[in-house]
Regions:
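Short alpha-helix
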Residues: 158-179
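A short, conserved alpha-helix within the catalytic core of class I
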Residues: 114-127
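Conserved SAM-binding strand-loop segment of SAM-dependent methyltransferases
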Residues: 83-96
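A short acidic, Gly/Pro-enriched loop at the edge of an enzyme's catalytic core
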Residues: 95-106
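Conserved beta-strand signature within the Rossmann-like core of class I S-adenosyl-L-methionine
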Residues: 134-142
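Conserved SAM/SAH-binding beta-strand->alpha-helix loop
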Residues: 69-71
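Conserved class I S-adenosyl-L-methionine
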Residues: 1-37, 39-48
Length: 205
């Protein structure tokens, strides 16, 4: 049984450990873009065990974060309590999440490449809809190079990112940073080793 055949069961099993499988520190690309965060609020999309949502709260933002795994949300709540941060956690998949139109000043999606192309287009549209004009969008994902490294991600070509995809999906944004690169990452036990990466930071017009 693969993660794509039974995703909720797969992820609940992966998160059923006291260990934070993606670590407790924020994603390195997200951290590098801190200067571009807008004051106010943030939405962390498919935030897993909460490392990025908690870090966003530590930057003084009012944070909503969701993930469909109950085990992940429980661990995220514990992480926030330990770091003395307030985050509004929602146990929900992206289709059922209560997306609020033009609500957030920042929307962040880190390694959420479970979505096939048609589903991804709809998810990107929801992220765009929820971001205020002038707000910041930050995305980190894997490129086709990741298929040879096999150090994380879905391992499916159709799920990989590239720069033309991002420029087309967010054509109404001003691109602040868009790069594809290879780097050594060390995010818990699940993301470790040389990786093919894409980072996008953009401002909604």
């Amino acid at each position: 049984m693969t993660a794509f055949n039974s995703p909720l069961n797969t992820w609940n099993q992966r998160f059923a450990t006291d260990q934070y499988i993606f670590g407790e520190a924020p994603n390195a690309y997200l951290h590098s873009q801190v200067a571009h965060l807008q004051a106010g609020s943030a939405l962390a999309v498919a935030d897993g065990e909460g490392r990025n949502g908690v870090w966003l709260a530590e930057q003084g933002l009012a944070v909503d974060a969701f993930d469909f795994s109950e085990n992940a949300i429980q661990k995220a709540q514990l992480l926030a309590e330990r770091r003395m941060q307030s985050v509004q956690w929602h146990c929900s998949d992206w289709q059922s999440f209560n997306w609020k139109a033009s609500h957030y000043t920042n929307v962040v999606g880190i390694f959420f490449q479970f979505a096939a192309p048609l589903e991804r287009k709809a998810l990107f549209a929801k992220m765009d809809e929820s971001l205020k004009s002038g707000g910041t969008l930050i995305i980190q994902g894997y490129t086709v190079a990741q298929l040879q490294f096999n150090t994380g991600g879905p391992g499916k070509l159709a799920h990989m990112y590239d720069e033309p995809l991002m420029r087309e999906a967010f054509a109404d944004y001003d691109i602040i940073d868009l790069q594809t690169y290879e780097a050594q990452i060390d995010e818990g036990t699940a993301h470790k080793g040389m990786s093919g990466l894409l980072g996008l930071t953009a401002r909604k017009r």
